[in-house]
Curated annotation (Swiss-Prot):
Fe cation 1 binds at residues 26, 56, 60, 113. It comes from Hirudo medicinalis (Medicinal leech). GO terms for molecular function: iron ion binding; oxygen carrier activity. Induction: Up-regulated after septic shoc. It comes from the Eukaryota. This is Neurohemerythrin.
Length: 120
């Protein structure tokens, strides 16, 4: 059972992980997925999403490594799996794939990222 996808699809305080840089990046991820949902045929929107995902995952993983975060391996695997699936997409992106990305981000933040609150 997952968390509810917000409508409109925007970051809100319920997604706060309490690391300002990560919260700002999460806002950017929401915006990138929202932009893709509005322009699924725009290859630039898909490339931008891939870029911000790569940058965010790198920053988040660096913070976890520096903190010797105990669940780093599982968390990184979730990132790798998402990136692999995202890399398989091409424009135009089907609505079900956009919905999948929205759902994944919501559930990843609230179900996985929340586990590192106060530990990084």
């Amino acid at each position: 059972m997952g968390f509810e996808i917000p409508e409109p699809y925007v970051w809100d305080e319920s997604f706060k992980v309490f690391y300002e840089n990560l919260d700002e990046e999460h806002k950017g991820l929401f915006q990138a997925i929202f932009n893709l949902s509005k322009s699924p045929a725009d290859n630039g929107a898909l490339k931008h999403l891939s870029k911000v995902i790569d940058e965010h995952f790198s920053h988040e993983e660096d913070m976890m490594k520096k903190a010797s975060y105990s669940d780093f391996d599982n968390h990184k695997k979730a990132h790798v799996d998402f990136q692999a699936s995202l890399g398989g997409l091409s424009s135009p992106v089907a609505n079900d794939k956009v919905h999948w990305a929205k759902d994944w981000l919501v559930n990843h933040i609230k179900g996985t990222d929340f586990l590192y609150k106060g530990k990084l």
